[in-house]
Amino acid sequence: MISGVDPQTHLPSGKPRWLKVKAPTSPGYLKLKGMLRQGGLHTVCEEATCPNIGQCWHEGSAAFMILGDTCTRRCAFCNVKTGKPLPPNPDEPQQLALTAQRMELKHVVITSVDRDDLEDGGAGQFIACIQALRRVLPEASVEVLTPDFRHKQGALERLVAARPDVFNHNVETVPRLYANVRPVSSYAFSLEVLRRAKQLNPEGMTKSGIMLGLGEDEAEVLAVFADLRAAGVDYLTVGQYLRPSPAHHAVVRYWEPERFEALGQQALQLGFKRVSSAPLARSSFHASELHGVDNA
């Protein structure tokens, strides 16, 4: 079992009431599910078992996950499967753009699995998706939530040159916990990715997110906020970690909604342009509103 936490940590039995959501069954949810299946597309909503899937899909919003559903890394918090991925689908960018058009999206979020097996880490597929969206939905803003493209020379530069409206890369947790939570990744490298993205495109918005409940303390969280601001990050998301299965990292603490609200206020005081800090906040949850766009 991947844990890295004290097994004696005590938590209330079951999730707190503020984390309970209804099972997705609405007509809007089912309609969007059909659209995505028709396009042969994946979403991080499904693959990462996001608790907000019912609400987002009911409202006609989804975060597209490109480059397949199999990741080359294994992070202790993530529910996306690990293995040997298939080659990129050359039809995926056009399928994604046409589906976004049918959904009448004004803000499109694209993320991906890690593709360390590809020479460019998948940057070329991100670029192709951005270009397809610009052709089909020229008025829509585009947000990319990317891997770190570690050891992929020139990949980040090429992607930022495609001018996504929002460049998002999550640090996920505090540096002390990286060895257990993100063993193949580097906190310092992720900060550099964000810093470099802002340097390459100062007019574009940069964004990052962190999960709480993995064993961090408040001082460490505030230090991450300060690091992100120093890297020029504009938007911040802060949400509660939820354990996908017993094989994943344990939840050490359920942070109360009031603490999320207080942290959000402290983040705004540090100079972030916009902050989403709540137990169910996620990188792509209400991403359009965070960027000042209404997808409704």
From Swiss-Prot:
Using the UniProt record, name the top-level EC class of this enzyme in a single word.
transferase
Question: What pathway or pathways are given for this protein in its record?
Answer: Protein modification; protein lipoylation via endogenous pathway; protein N(6)-(lipoyl)lysine from octanoyl-[acyl-carrier-protein]: step 2/2
Q: What would be one Gene Ontology cellular-component term for the protein? A: cytoplasm
- Where in the cell? Cytoplasm
Residues recorded as binding [4Fe-4S] cluster 1, renumbered to this chain, are C45, C50, C56, S284
Q: How is the cofactor bound?
A: Binds 2 [4Fe-4S] clusters per subunit. One cluster is coordinated with 3 cysteines and an exchangeable S-adenosyl-L-methionine.
* Entry keyword Transferase: yes
Any Pfam family: LIAS_N
Q: What is this protein called?
A: Lipoyl synthase
Q: Which organism is it from?
A: Magnetococcus marinus (strain ATCC BAA-1437 / JCM 17883 / MC-1)
